[in-house]
Amino acid sequence: MTSQDSLTSIGAARIAVTALLDGGVRHVVVAPGSRSAPMAYALAEAEAAGRVRLHVRIDERDAGFTALGLALSTEAPVAVVTTSGTAVGNLLPAVMEANHSAVPVVVISADRPEELHGTGANQTTIQLDLFGDHVRFAVDVPAGDHPQKAVATALYAATGALEDTPPGPVQVNLAFRDPLVPADGDALPAAAGHGVFHYDAGPQALNLPAASGELAERRTVVLAGHDAGPVAEAFARAHGLPLLAEPSSNARFGRNAVGPYRVLLAHFGPDSPTPIERVVLFGRATLSRPVASLLARESVVSAIYQPVPVAWYEEGRRRETPIETLPELADFAGRGSAEWLDSWLLAGAAAQHGLDGVLAGEDLANGPSVGATVWEHSRGQLVLGSSNGIRDVDLAGQPHPEPIATVYANRGLAGIDGTIATATGIALGSGRETTVLLGDVTFLHDAGGLLLGHGEPVPDLRIVVLNDSGGAIFSLLEHGAVEDSGAYGTAVERLFGTPHSVGIGALAAAYGVGHQTVSTTAELAAALKSPLKGRTIVEVRVDRSGLRALHARIKEAVSAAVGQVLTAG
């Protein structure tokens, strides 16, 4: 392209915006910056015309996670626009999560023109391939070049249209020369109102034909990991098999679902009268060591249902046999006998009874009781933060008869960063009431996610913070035993517990977000049932000093209750 043919920066930006919209983008998150100004102006024009919804964030890390949440709830590509320099690097955590979760986040990174690189020019660095293998596609568009093909190809890759490639993040690095503002005489078009950019599928259940009586009877369990979907529940029901479903599987419901399954696995171990023979895995199981141990048992044959490529799986790296079709999976799984399913359901009911009995004896709220209460009262959309929150729900949340909420979690890399921003994006993308459960450390890590500028869309978002003044999860791992031994003094508490005394109420007030404090599950249940408009924080103050002992009592009570049932059977 000759200099006479080169596009102005605003002209190139308008073409890029048109290509984004043509590719299905309806939400764009914009972080302020001068080099990205052409994109900002072009997007403002598109928003005024009612063609796109913009979300402005001053923190690029939160911009990235907001885009991630929007893409999760709308099931469509979402773009995030930044200026040059470190602004682009702040997107890395969200891009990493999007990669491992196969979420189509489109990074539009503005850049200095080629002649400024290597000169020491301000905010100028190598931005192409900054995200390495975490993006499906990355391309440089030099200043003045036509960006349509680059943007279209990026969207093609982001949405999983490339052969044998799952959806995921992409990067389009657009260089812009001065002038970075519209030409004299340009102006926003007359406001045409906003289009409807919400996507609301809601929780779903599926039906599959009952398993053929010719299938062999096998002691198979259906394990539904993250993002398994309702097909896992339908398969378990059709084959008469126990369903062991993580909360973010969106399959933790129905008559075959077993609640506290992870504390039951030892009762159906290799030395039991009725050991598990086979496992059918839907989605990705990430939450507990008992499940990891089950999948590693030499005596257990396992398969993973994988109809399309997934981002986290490399062939030959796992023990499970990948199976692409449900008929093949049916042949592998067989069907469960009535005795096999009943033994699991009876054991599950006994375990739930034992667990509930321990929790009922506690005067104040604790992690498992908060998880159970949030799960019981979930509706609309539920976002579960990493660390203990999602595991508390997995342990104590009793499966519902039918799906009542769509559940999300950042389980791609299971980091605690960006959880508030992700939940905000999820709520804005659907327009539905959303509750997020997270710990105080996760909350503080993304406190900036509470910041919404004047005039920005405000979601209906309830933020439940389990505040135990630090990181309780480490006390349930090997580090808890090290602390109990006293061999390292206070080092374990300092390095892993990370105690603090932040006033969450004061922090909420600073951001203009409502706040209330509760200390019992009854108070929490009342807060969860209250009508929700806008954003509010429900802080549940708990003491983590006795958490390790509480889990020991739960394990003992469950073991006794289940032992009685299985012995009687």
UniProtKB/Swiss-Prot annotation:
Co-factor: note: Binds 1 thiamine pyrophosphate per subunit.
Cofactor(s), by name: Mg(2+); Mn(2+); thiamine diphosphate
GO biological processes: menaquinone biosynthetic process
SUPFAM superfamilies: Thiamin diphosphate-binding fold (THDP-binding)
Stored InterPro entries: MenaQ_synth_MenD, THDP-binding, Thiamin_PyroP_enz_TPP-bd_dom, TPP_enzyme_TPP-bd
Catalysed transformations (reactions): isochorismate + 2-oxoglutarate + H(+) = 5-enolpyruvoyl-6-hydroxy-2-succinyl-cyclohex-3-ene-1-carboxylate + CO2
Broad EC category: transferase
Any GO MF annotation of the entry: manganese ion binding
UniProt EC number: 2.2.1.9
Keyword set includes Glycoprotein: no
Any single Pfam family the record assigns to this protein: TPP_enzyme_C
This protein's UniProt keywords: Magnesium, Manganese, Menaquinone biosynthesis, Metal-binding, Thiamine pyrophosphate, Transferase
Positions of transmembrane segments: none
Pathway(s) this gene product operates in, as recorded in its UniProt entry: Quinol/quinone metabolism; 1,4-dihydroxy-2-naphthoate biosynthesis; 1,4-dihydroxy-2-naphthoate from chorismate: step 2/7; Quinol/quinone metabolism; menaquinone biosynthesis
HAMAP family found in the cross-reference section: MenD
Role played: Catalyzes the thiamine diphosphate-dependent decarboxylation of 2-oxoglutarate and the subsequent addition of the resulting succinic semialdehyde-thiamine pyrophosphate anion to isochorismate to yield 2-succinyl-5-enolpyruvyl-6-hydroxy-3-cyclohexene-1-carboxylate (SEPHCHC).
Family statement drawn from the similarity comment of this UniProt entry: Belongs to the TPP enzyme family. MenD subfamily.
Subunit field text: Homodimer.
NCBIfam families associated with the record: menD (TIGR00173)
Protein name: 2-succinyl-5-enolpyruvyl-6-hydroxy-3-cyclohexene-1-carboxylate synthase
